[in-house]
Amino acid sequence: MESFATLIQNRRSTRKFTERLLSPEQVQLILRAALMAPSSKRSESWQFVVVEDKEMLARLAACKRNGAAFLEGCALAVVVLGNVMESDVWIEDASVASIYMQLQAEDLGLGSCWCQIRNRETEDETPAGEYVRQLLDIPYQLEVLSIIGFGYKGQERKPFDESRLRWEKVHIGKFSLPEQEGGEA
């Protein structure tokens, strides 16, 4: 395993995948990472629907106006759900589980990409979450946060360029704007 610093620098969104399928062991490791993610008060308010069927992946790719087409080409999609009856911070809990899966995938040499569903719409203005709910028979108390696509990388992207880090977004001690600090960032 490479260092965590290298792992997060190398993890980039992958929207093009090869045709190669994931092994059951790889899928299990990705899901294991999600299930090991921390959650508020250990509520574990998340649920996951695993989709490998190519026809269903193609249908999921139509879940919103833009930004979901890559799902049709991935080997695996994990639909990330949160139980609104179990936790008032289901969004945060499900988000942490999602990034754990993405980091595990990167560690395995796989690509991944987050497809935001919550607060998005299909072409015909149906809420994207409702579209996914109907496709996958998701019960009413579960909200769809996202769909994470996984697969072997069909494109290699350069690691994150550290010169692009926006250190002006970091405030020490208290919030202050650059002009409050004498114009320096």
Region annotations inferred by a language model:
Residues M1-A185:
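Acidic, surface-exposed loops and disordered segments
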